[in-house]
Amino acid sequence: EFDFAIEILCGLFDEIKLTSHDFNNEKGRIKAEIREKDRRSSLDFYFNSIVWKNSEVEKIVLGYCKTIDRVSVKKINEFRQKVLSAGNCFVYATGNISDKNLDALNKKISELDISQSNPGFTNTVTVNNEFFHREKKIWIKNNYWHYIQIGFDVDCSKYPGGVYDLLYALLFNGDKALVYNYLSEDNPIIYSYDSTFEQYDNVGNINFSFEVDRNKIEDVFKTVVELLNAAKDGRFNFEANLNYEMFNWELDLDNPDNLNWNMAYYNHILKTQPIDYSDEFYGRFRVTKEQIIDAAKYIFRRCNMTVAVKGDRKKINAEAIEKILESLD
């Protein structure tokens, strides 16, 4: 099975050869997926177009139908040679893999006929003038149902990566996260919830989104502000949350898929303190409560904040929301 997996993996580096009929069929499937997902009408697309304006990550990964129409087999192969080059690829293996398996993988990779160049890509994004200087504005996209997305700009060079990850986990990510737990479990006023920490070497954005009844929009903003200010004041159980987060990371030792992502992404792609599972605190989590409080004070400010609401424009009191958000500063 491992040998078969090697063949599939190394096949990614082969020249793409398709008939015009097969290529057009594949393009048709991709365009159908784009239309079906209709991401351009989503709150997430609207939010990202504000946060990442004029940057490389403003556009959706899947692309647009008009872009797909311009793609050719020749263009794909040119891009493949540039991206799948020796200077831009690495292989990270986790799980029940023997030395014999690794030797076979190394041998197969060494035989690949790929470019030895490095395309010079960096894991950074262009920062627009609004980053860290956000306009005090509630961005509204008209809709019948009401959804809210709130995000904060992050300077990824200011604190070690473990500080941001723990702050994100503490407040927004997972069943025990303070914001999620309070809004959804302890005092349920939202219907759905999602969170993201979009992170690059220079900047990032911590954001979370949810659906809410239109009559509770102002209440939910008051609650969010109270929770963020509590984090800035240190009113949270740091030790319990640290232990819970480290317990989750320990579970990844039994999950080769998650472990592979963590080791490859944090140790080789992001410029953060590497993960060392032999270390009591995994290196990255030698974090103090004071660091979390300091980071919270720096991040959760109006100048870093983007608020996008999808709902009935006539029923949303933007001035009242803005008045509530003043308490963050």
Describe each model-derived feature in a short phrase.
Residues 88, 117-180:
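His/Glu-based metal-binding/catalytic segments typifying zinc-dependent metallopeptidases
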Residues 1-121, 154-155, 185-329:
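Charge-rich, well-structured scaffold segments of protease-associated domains
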